[in-house]
């Protein structure tokens, strides 16, 4: 865990991170009541959707955030945007939103400036929404601050309550062991966290869909199904490819 400030001791670093966690914890608590997950507040019909992702230069705090916008009907790419940045905020598990959301919001500003006619009605983020220990992952954080309907799609299980990768794989094996099947995942109180989606037919390669903001889980699932060719849905896959291509150039 690293907090990039010059000349600080290890003790100072720990103190700063504790202060950061306390501040971010309070902000997440304040954000949760603002999340809309029981109704769709999406402009209809959907014309454009987008994927957001971020990649890092190895052993560096340099990063590239990317946004790829698609025509929803044809799934053709209509715009690509990227932003080179330096992320000086420490990565702390469970608080990823505070590191990535400001950059994603800046990308939205760039998009509105350069191609406002292509504004996406729904955004897919590589990460989690309400599937989060405090029900406020990156997709929810971004959604509330941007006001744009969005949901998260993650390749990794975020442990909440007693949910683990092994328990999810067992659940998928029992109830959704074939390609394009999914199961609803709930927390200890019976609240829905999201879907574990068996895209490829291998339970070990499932992805995890959760509501971010202004969208229901059912609608998020429908959109995911309509834009997915491989394990990773196309908007996020293309955003990832774009950011990695730029990172590769920066690394040379």
Give the residues covered by each predicted segment.
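C-terminal binding/interaction regions
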Residues: 2-37, 41-43, 111, 164-252
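Short, basic, glycine/proline-bearing loop/turn elements
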Residues: 15, 19-22, 87-91, 122-128
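Two-metal-ion RNase H-like nuclease active-site motif
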Residues: 47-57
């Amino acid at each position: 865990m690293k907090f990039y400030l010059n000349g600080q001791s290890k003790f100072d670093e720990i103190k700063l991170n504790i202060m950061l966690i306390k501040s971010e914890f309070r902000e997440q608590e304040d954000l949760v009541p603002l999340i809309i997950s029981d109704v769709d507040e999406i402009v209809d019909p959907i014309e454009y959707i987008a994927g957001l992702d971020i990649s890092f230069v190895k052993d560096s705090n340099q990063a590239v955030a990317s946004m790829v916008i698609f025509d929803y009907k044809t799934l053709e790419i209509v715009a690509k945007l990227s932003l080179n940045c330096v992320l000086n905020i420490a990565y702390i598990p469970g608080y990823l939103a505070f590191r990535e959301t400001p950059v994603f919001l800046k990308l939205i500003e760039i998009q509105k400036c350069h191609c406002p006619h292509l504004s996406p009605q729904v955004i897919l983020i590589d990460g989690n929404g309400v599937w989060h220990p405090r029900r406020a992952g990156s997709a929810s954080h971004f959604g509330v601050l941007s006001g744009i309907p969005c949901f998260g799609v993650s390749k990794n299980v975020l442990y909440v309550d007693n949910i683990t990768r092994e328990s999810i794989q067992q659940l998928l094996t029992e109830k959704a062991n074939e390609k394009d099947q999914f199961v609803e995942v709930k927390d200890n109180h019976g609240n829905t966290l999201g879907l574990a989606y068996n895209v490829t037919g291998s339970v070990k390669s499932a992805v995890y869909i959760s509501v971010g903001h202004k969208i229901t889980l059912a609608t998020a699932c429908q959109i995911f199904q309509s834009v997915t060719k491989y394990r990773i849905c196309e908007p996020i896959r293309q955003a990832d490819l774009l950011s990695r291509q730029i990172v590769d150039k920066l690394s040379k």
